[in-house]
């Protein structure tokens, strides 16, 4: 969905902006269109988009902005205030450069939000938005690549974008998911898996990490948490964690230095068993 959406709104030589940290596959998706991915530097520790830098980086060649909320790897949910200002910047820059800048919103974790909060819809803030969604997260169907692209009414080219993406899918060799999965998911539009387990797991990890002195932003959704590593080299920190049977992902993968991603899309008992290992890992850096 993301690859098709980007291809539909860009031409070779165009620029696509995204915010660090970001899902690493964005790079190949954009490169495959002949466009260039430019990455807005992160704004730690909150990891809300760095809108001051964003405003400065938008140029005449910018035709698309790619966002991900709730965010992988941080778990951060972009606030309504953030989305309002982002929309204002996009509107202003579109007028200045004489062409609309599209917003592609990657939202596979939309249903996984904590504290009873609702995730703001980026499309509600900016008209030229294409929304990408996947059922693999909310229905716990990892590996089943089934989702959609929704073009907001009023978006430039709304009459042709959907047809364009259907043809892009054919020409790039992307096949439809098996029909039995499509039919099954079609009957599950109003349900999700038990997503409360993710919030339980998040609270266990967040409480333990903060108690151990890690610098970490509390996730607002997803099933990831993104603490700062206890040394500058995140790769070295991940190798150290393996000595305690902890498998972490270094933040270099996501365009940021010095952090690690922990995934907690596992049963709660396994999360509980990991807590003593985190204690041992932290203790190893206090020696």
Predicted regions and their residues:
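PLP-dependent class I/II
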Residues: 1-287
